[in-house]
Amino acid sequence: MPIVSKYSNERVEKIIQDLLDVLVKEEVTPDLALMCLGNAVTNIIAQVPESKRVAVVDNFTKALKQSV
């Protein structure tokens, strides 16, 4: 069963491209890009209610592993 997102592909792709454009503009190495994105993810997770954080992290890491 395909996953249905509440966000349009166009919106998601635009945001991803904007993020990648910043990384290219700053000429970051892959390790610096991952460090910056990892810190951003940590900041975003901190905004999730504490009672839901473990589930969010589990889902995020599962999706990340499946995408590699």
UniProtKB/Swiss-Prot annotation:
InterPro entries: UPF0352, YejL_sf. Coiled coil: none annotated. HAMAP family: UPF0352. Belongs to the UPF0352 family. This is UPF0352 protein CPS_2611. It comes from Colwellia psychrerythraea (strain 34H / ATCC BAA-681) (Vibrio psychroerythus). The lineage of its organism: Bacteria, Pseudomonadati, Pseudomonadota, Gammaproteobacteria, Alteromonadales.
